[in-house]
Amino acid sequence: MSARPVLITGGEGQLASDLRELLDDSPVAAPGREALDITDDDAVGRTLAEVQPTLVFNCAAFHNVDLCEREEDRSFEVNARAVKRLAERCAEAEAKLVHMSTNYVFDGSAEAPYQEDDAPAPQSIYALSKLAGEYAALAYAPGALVARTGGLYGQYGSASKGGNFVTRMLQRAREQGELAVVADQRLSPTPTADLAAAVIEAVRAGAGGLVHLTASGSCSWHEFTEAIVELAGVEVEVRPTETTRPPGGARRPLNGVLARPRADALGLTPLPHWREGLESYMEAAGLLAVSGAPS
């Protein structure tokens, strides 16, 4: 990237960890939440003054989708108001802001994949707060890049979610002998290692504004789970179910697939197909079936 400093907020998360590994040609500060709470504007100001970054990746977020419904103020504080203050700080410091967002900003009612210029229609507190964060980043940090993505999983897992979807499904498969997974939600499951490489490429290309960055192709959560257990060599029934909304829970879009005409116009490399990405991740994590080994 450059020899100039880079700051990554939410530094202990899945994506941040992969960004940190790929940015090995730059000094990187990647404080976790305990070291830097982005809702603490004074702490953010001190960190920017100490690190003096030319590039800031905001990977901090409150992304427990159902909990956001019950903690609306916290959701907007972390995902929107703190982003506005961070964007203002980046503008003052002349640092480029890269802000991560979500496919949940769309309502999922369309049949085709969503393009960058399609109108958002958030259906949950989480989605609404993330959309507000997008607007804040673009309005208050000149040249900011907002990257929408979804279905993330990575080598480092998510502390707030107890690992990642792949490892959780494999654990349940081995413990329960049967899985029930929604078959009516479509998305493009994306390894954070592939996303990190794509985001860095976008920055190097000088991209600003809004881009969609997800794995190529799409599948349902049910199809994704079937691929996981197949690649792991675990013999288990994966039963398809329909989406239900738990009491007090968030509404999830049935179509979470993102198209990327703007990313393509910028000449950015498409991410690998979701199944290719899954196999690469599982191989690196030691999760692929070993020929002749029992499941």
Predicted regions and their residues:
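SDR active-site strand-loop-helix element
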Residues: 9, 31, 59-60, 97-102, ...
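NAD(P)H-binding glycine-rich loop region in Rossmannoid oxidoreductase-like domains
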Residues: 38-80, 89-91
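Adenosine-cofactor binding site in Rossmann-like domains, unifying the SAM/SAH pocket
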Residues: 24-46
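Mid/C-terminal beta-alpha module of Rossmann-like enzyme folds, strongest
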Residues: 198, 205-249, 254, 274, ...
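N-terminal Rossmann NAD(P)H-binding glycine-rich loop of SDR-like oxidoreductase domains
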Residues: 4-22
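Active-site Tyr-X1-5-Lys
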Residues: 121-145
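NAD(P)-dependent short-chain dehydrogenase/reductase
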Residues: 138-187, 193-194
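Conserved Rossmann-fold NAD(P)-dependent oxidoreductase catalytic core, especially the SDR/UDP-sugar
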Residues: 84-121, 125, 140
